[in-house]
């Protein structure tokens, strides 16, 4: 009986710890309602086989003209200029070698997006073009523990007059905003990493199951829509009434 009691106590303690670890922001929450009134064009309203490829000025212009909010990705060049580009490497979209961070902004202008006339845009230029017409979801692309993107991009965003929020797969980026600008709507991106098969290890178990929410305290969780069964995601939405976002939906049947 004593052993059974100890086992039950351990189970209860672990369960309590789990619920505390996945808990998103519960108090002093900014209003997320205005963001829920929109549908968002992921990387702009794009088609990589056209002259409006992903994360291009043309794709963002099309999205704004069609009345869609815009989701986009930002990262730093070698000379610390925020540009809009999804992958850390150039290969898939531009056919080039190396990473965005291996090149200065001027050097990146030799590359075209998906064989179109479009080139990698500066984040600053995208902000000027959108000019508050539609809301922005800004994904911060952060490798490992390098948070230098956060203060540089944040300075631009603080001067921007339109509606925006931030999100990141890297919990350190979300944590940075929790500490520096708690007034801003912030989101934790995640995926069923272990089920995808590309990632292994304890880190991806932690990220998949949102076990750092107690550190980042996100206002919303954006999850791969193919995995609605992930328990932590369901609990965040159902138990804690945390705003849920889904990526990337290509058909109305998935809404």
Give names to the regions the model predicted:
Residues 2-253:
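Phosphate-group recognition and catalysis centered on beta-loop-alpha active-site segments
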